[in-house]
Amino acid sequence: MPKKFYVSWDNLQREARRLARRQLPVSQWKGIIAVSRGGLVPAALMARELGIRNVETLCISSYDHNNQRDLVVVKAATTAGDGEGWLVVEDLVDTGTTAKAIRELYPKAKFIAIFAKPMGEQLLDDFEVAIPQDTWIEQPWDMALEFATPICDEE
């Protein structure tokens, strides 16, 4: 079983804000391309921090929670053209398979992610947190808070 890295909502927002600060000035951006689904929340955070209201989606699928499978482009961000002036936002770049496809679709876009693993890191223009390749990231939207039984009541 791979190591796991758990991301809280607070941690995600803090890292997104740090990454957003490096994307200034805002005037250089026509909009954001949110990579669905993992990049939707980070893109919303970026849009808020940068004051960008033009948000497109690229619906691309290569994971079924824990399993990587064939890449499928469900919907492209057609108004973004070759990506010039656009900021592509993803939560994580892992092996680079999805990132390569995104680079082919939008070669002139700036491609950023909150988290990056070594195999995909070189495909990004910017990222905030380096994660070891053998570590699985659990994002806050995939988890739920639940009641923890007090130690004295565990028996």
Swiss-Prot record:
Its EC number is 2.4.2.-, 2.4.2.22. It is found in: Cell inner membrane. PROSITE patterns: PUR_PYR_PR_TRANSFER. Keywords: Cell inner membrane, Cell membrane, Glycosyltransferase, Magnesium, Membrane, Metal-binding, Purine salvage, Transferase. It comes from the Bacteria. Homotetramer. This is Xanthine-guanine phosphoribosyltransferase. It comes from Aeromonas hydrophila subsp. hydrophila (strain ATCC 7966 / DSM 30187 / BCRC 13018 / CCUG 14551 / JCM 1027 / KCTC 2358 / NCIMB 9240 / NCTC 8049).
